[in-house]
Amino acid sequence: VKHVPEGLVLGWEYLYDDNKEADDLIAELCYSLPNDEEIIIMSKDGDLIQMMALPNVSLHDFTSMLSDEIIFGKYGITPKQYLDYKSLSGDKADNIPGIRGIGPKTAEKYLSEYQTIDNFPPELLDEEGIELTKLWKRISTIPFHQS
């Protein structure tokens, strides 16, 4: 925010809200634009991977444009599976512990086989595990996320 006046002189527009995180504001902007508008988000925030599930949204990490293939190569999942992956394996940066005994490789394996947490057979997660994944997913979901 301290650079906003300089940006205004250059003609930049900005959006700021004391009650929202940057990724929430970015999501609001993405959903407010017409679906035929190409949107490129420049951020290293992994939470924004979920926005790549929208057909008109691309993510650039300041090094390169990310694609479904790059996300798959890094995580073994698609952008649409990112929330389930994070809910299972956890994310220290966001204080999401995930499910005990499930790390990135196991989450990748399960999602490869069952696609979503909703398709997991009952023996894969106990009742507590199911409730926890729903909680972590709800906490991790950027507002306005549409499945």
Regions found by a protein language model. Name each.
Residues 1-147:
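Extended two-metal-dependent nuclease catalytic cores across DNA- and RNA-processing enzymes
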